[in-house]
Swiss-Prot record:
Single Gene Ontology MF annotation: amino acid binding
Family assignment from sequence similarity: Belongs to the aspartate/ornithine carbamoyltransferase superfamily. ATCase family.
Binding positions (carbamoyl phosphate): 71-72, 121, 151, 154, 280-281
Keyword Transmembrane helix set for record: no
Protein name per UniProt: Aspartate carbamoyltransferase catalytic subunit
GO biological process, one term: 'de novo' pyrimidine nucleobase biosynthetic process
The species this protein was found in: Cupriavidus necator (strain ATCC 17699 / DSM 428 / KCTC 22496 / NCIMB 10442 / H16 / Stanier 337)
Lineage: superkingdom: Bacteria
Name of the gene encoding the protein in the UniProt record: pyrB
GO cellular component annotations of the record: cytosol
One Pfam family from the record: OTCace_N
Length: 324
């Protein structure tokens, strides 16, 4: 008898109760998140003195960041507070996990404190899935980045940014450049782009930093930066994930910049109205030139701004769905 696979992110009725990965989400579901985020962007842009809505009033959101973060943790905190939630940021270094307590014991203890939602960043791929399997039916889990695996809210805010500036996904060429091998953002972006109907997704980087199987995901692979940038509409730059590298995969940061750094001259090979994106943190002079990062085609700070609205949308949507 064949066992039916059930997406652990979804309720029995197919609604989103956790956000663990973009993989497995339908085009309609991603579009619904982006449309909802658009409403929150409008709220932030309005003249209202109070930017809050009562969607999560009375709910407790626990931010559990087992890896360092600035943008993601801060924007999740702002998003939860704008939804009127009570927010607790757990200091992992001062918590019992630093004393040997297991991840699930930590989650069980926090659940006993009436947690309604966990936002989790962890170095181990799959950690948010493990948590989602063990929480009570009314508790929701959002993956804020797990190992090399996925960073779904970054992928969604990247899609929101692209849609904002380019409108239609179905006539775009998008290039992702850099350390794709170690990048959870790249994986999430690729799944989102292909699901939303982008006809050509390119991966550009040295052989040592590109994973196998990209072609099977519908991605065109380029090892030559200039060739890969020709005629693209969107350039997504990635930093070198030195903390996840083992062994000498690159000769030096300077050599990397010579071969794969995004300079104004290289950007000129893309379409004239191409936009430049970066999930941060940026390493200027390594993967991107300051003239590009701060230039007129850069939408990097827009990504950060849109990230709040996208995370508000995700939290609001999952909070309304459960198997109870």
């Amino acid at each position: 008898m064949t066992k039916t696979f059930r997406n652990p992110q979804l309720t029995k009725n197919g609604e989103l109760k956790h956000l663990l990965s973009i993989e497995g989400l339908s085009r309609d579901m991603i579009t619904h998140i982006l449309d909802t985020a658009s409403q929150f962007v409008s709220l932030s842009d309005s003249d209202r003195d109070v930017k809050k809505v009562p969607l999560l009033r009375g709910k407790s959101v626990f931010n559990l960041f087992f890896e360092n973060s600035t943008r993601t943790r801060t924007t999740f905190e702002i998003a939860a507070k704008r939804l009127s939630a009570d927010v607790l940021n757990l200091n992992i270094n001062a918590s019992s996990t630093s004393k040997g307590e297991s991840l699930l014991d930590t989650i069980n203890n926090l659940s006993a404190m009436s947690a309604d939602m966990f936002v989790v960043r962890h170095a181990s791929s799959g950690a948010p899935y493990l948590i989602a399997e063990h929480v009570a039916p009314h508790v929701h889990v959002i993956n804020a980045g797990d190992g090399r695996h996925a960073h779904p809210t970054q992928g969604l805010l990247d899609m929101y940014t692209i849609r904002h500036f380019k409108k239609d996904f179905t006539n775009l060429t998008v290039a992702i450049v850099g350390d794709i091998l170690h990048s959870r953002v790249a994986r999430s972006d690729i799944h989102a782009l292909t699901t939303l109907g982008v006809p050509e997704v390119r991966a550009i980087g040295p052989r040592t930093l590109l994973p196998s199987g990209l072609e099977q995901m519908g991605v065109r692979v380029f090892h030559d930066m200039e060739e890969g940038l020709k005629g693209v509409d969107v350039v997504i730059m990635l930093r070198l994930q030195n903390e996840r590298m083992s062994g000498a995969l690159l000769p030096s940061a300077q050599e990397y910049f010579k071969a794969y750094g995004l300079t104004p001259e290289r950007l000129a090979l893309a379409n004239r109205d191409a936009i430049v994106m970066h999930p941060g943190p940026m390493n200027r002079g390594v993967e991107i030139d300051s003239a590009v990062a701060d230039g007129p085609q850069s939408v990097i700070l827009n990504q950060v701004t849109f990230g709040i609205a996208v995370r508000m949308a995700v939290m609001g949507i999952v909070a309304g769905n459960s198997d109870e």
